[in-house]
Amino acid sequence: MATPERRTAPGTPAVHTGAPVASGPVPVMAPLGWLLILAAGTTLILGSWLLYGTTAEGMWAGYHDGIIGTVVVLAGMGLNTSLPKQPLLGICGLAGILLILFAVFFDYPTHVVVIEMVSGVGLLLGVGLYASGRRD
């Protein structure tokens, strides 16, 4: 009969992997804020194309909301690059404040006021979430 052999030498030390690395929470706030910024800008652009009328109020609201929406979408896409984040967040925040002021003080039809108010509040919430979720 054959005698069983030991596979490892008795002097071989056991391999220790060390203490497990503590992982932090999954970053949710910044991506959610970024998504909200882009959604608000896209809503503003699509609303100005599809919902605003061809009257004087609808045309002027379409002009400034289309420009603001385009700037917001470009700034939102810039947040995922190596560009500095603070100026882009400032642009988005100012656009949100401006949209809320447009909705409150201009005498536009109800659907224009709703689109501007929803986009403005969405922008401010997105900027707040993005800024609170960033650690750099």
Task: Name each region found by the language model.
Residues 1-33:
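Intrinsic N-terminal pre-sequences and regulatory tails
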Residues 20-30, 47-58, 74-84:
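Short juxtamembrane and helix-loop transition motifs at transmembrane-helix boundaries
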Residues 30, 123-136:
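Membrane-water interface at the C-terminal end of transmembrane alpha helices
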Residues 39-54, 100-102:
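Membrane-embedded alpha-helical segments in integral membrane proteins
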Residues 57-69, 89-90, 115-120:
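Structural signature of hydrophobic alpha-helical transmembrane segments
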Residues 78-90, 132-136:
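Membrane-helix interface "capping/anchor" motifs
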Residues 83, 99-117, 135:
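Membrane-helix boundary connector in multi-pass membrane proteins
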Residues 88-103:
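Hydrophobic alpha-helical membrane segments
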